[in-house]
């Protein structure tokens, strides 16, 4: 003990220890893996995802969630004989509609930072955002190439609608990036701007199925109305449906992401709309709660549900095919 006491009491002892310990520590640290994942590492998915989902590909994963050829009822209504008279075209249209629709969902979930899709982990949480986005673009490119070679008469319809879908999505992303400074000020102009965005982003997807089947635009107005109803339904269930909140793992995901939706636009225009603005600019829990009280108020909720009912009047037969009917059962806490 005396030796160690004498050794530690010498002025040079700590210098000697530093000379020994620092290189050894540095050498050991150099061989350790990162304790926390880096931002770049988070872009990469989990190894061997097939062990988690039994599927290796993000597109196959989301297709398993939604099923295949879920646009078939629309195609059959537009052309009851297409399946038997031109089976190759029939199958190609269903593949195109699956591909465009589901790949948009894959990228949307990345943009929104969604945790779940229909109660299942969002694809990018398994495969990583980079691979998920690339697979989506890869699948769409495959469909474009195949359409151009096998069904060149369908290619112009597909390209035009895809451009409109992405134009609408771009508008939505710019509004989210720049906030209300990029959005109209007057109430009527706000609603019109939002409807135009939905006409592009959602409307073009629905118009696409009609144009591919009939190779004309004769059903554009009808399918645009179906699309507007679908957009309203999706927007409303985001803030009014408890079933949807459970499936997504969050309520008011649009608001939390700073993304405009029809209930948010309507809420901006009511007397207490000033409480919504801070939630879009500074998304603190307090601001979100204040905004939700307005968005889930009877006034805003009734305006939104009335618009849904109004848009549904002329398209009941199409909505029966669409078959989505979430309960809008959530209201503001008084």
Curated annotation (Swiss-Prot):
Sites where the protein binds substrate: 101, 117, 201-202, 231, 238, 248
What does the entry list as the binding residues for Mg(2+) 2?
108, 112
Inducing factors: The onset of expression correlates with the onset of aflatrem biosynthesis in stationary cultures. Expression is induced by the developmental and secondary metabolism regulator veA. Expression is also regulated by nsdC.
Task: Kindly give the Pfam families that the UniProt entry links to this protein.
Answer: polyprenyl_synt (PF00348)
Establish whether keyword Membrane is in the entry.
no
Q: In which pathway does it act?
A: Secondary metabolite biosynthesis
Instruction: Please name the GO terms of the biological process aspect recorded for this protein, alphabetically.
Output: alcohol biosynthetic process; isoprenoid biosynthetic process; mycotoxin biosynthetic process
Domain of life assignment: Eukaryota
Q: Which CDD domains match?
A: Trans_IPPS
Output the Gene Ontology terms for molecular function. metal ion binding; prenyltransferase activity
Briefly, what is this protein's role? Prenyl transferase; part of the ATM1 gene cluster that mediates the biosynthesis of aflatrem, a tremorgenic mycotoxin with acute neurotoxic effects. Synthesis of geranylgeranyl diphosphate (GGPP) by AtmG (a GGPP synthase) precedes condensation of GGPP with indole 3-glycerol phosphate, followed by epoxidation and cyclization by AtmM (a FAD-dependent monooxygenase) and AtmC (a prenyltransferase) to produce paspaline. AtmB is also essential for paspaline production, but its exact role has not been identified yet.
- This chain belongs to the protein called Prenyl transferase atmC
Gene encoding this polypeptide? atmC
């Amino acid at each position: 003990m005396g030796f160690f006491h004498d050794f530690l009491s010498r002025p040079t002892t700590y210098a000697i220890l530093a000379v020994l310990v620092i290189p050894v520590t540095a050498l050991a640290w150099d061989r350790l893996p990162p304790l926390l994942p880096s931002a770049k590492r988070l872009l990469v998915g989990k190894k061997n995802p097939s062990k988690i989902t039994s599927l290796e590909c993000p597109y196959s994963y989301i297709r398993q969630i939604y099923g295949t050829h879920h646009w078939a009822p629309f195609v059959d209504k537009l052309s009851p004989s297409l399946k038997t008279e031109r089976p190759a075209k029939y199958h190609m249209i269903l593949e195109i509609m699956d591909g465009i629709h589901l790949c948009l969902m894959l990228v949307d979930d990345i943009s929104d930072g969604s945790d779940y899709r229909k109660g299942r982990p969002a694809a990018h949480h398994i495969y990583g955002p980079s691979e998920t986005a690339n697979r989506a673009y890869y699948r769409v490119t495959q469909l474009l190439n195949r359409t151009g070679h096998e069904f060149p008469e369908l290619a112009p319809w597909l390209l035009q609608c895809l451009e409109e879908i992405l134009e609408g999505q771009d508008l939505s992303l710019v509004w989210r990036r720049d906030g209300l400074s990029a959005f109209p000020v007057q109430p009527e102009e706000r609603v019109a701007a939002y409807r135009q965005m939905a006409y592009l982003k959602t409307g073009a997807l629905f118009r696409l199925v009609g144009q591919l089947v009939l190779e004309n635009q004769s059903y554009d107005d009808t399918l645009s109305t179906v699309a507007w109803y679908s957009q309203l339904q999706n927007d409303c269930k985001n803030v009014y449906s408890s079933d949807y909140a459970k499936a997504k793992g969050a309520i008011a995901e649009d608001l939390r992401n700073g993304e405009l939706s029809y209930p948010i636009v309507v809420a901006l225009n009511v007397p207490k709309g000033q409480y919504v603005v801070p939630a879009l600019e500074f998304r603190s829990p307090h601001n979100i709660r204040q905004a939700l009280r307005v968005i889930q108020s009877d006034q805003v909720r009734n305006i939104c549900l009335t618009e849904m009912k109004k848009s549904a009047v002329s398209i009941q037969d199409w909505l029966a095919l669409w078959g989505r009917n979430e309960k809008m059962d959530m209201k503001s806490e008084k």
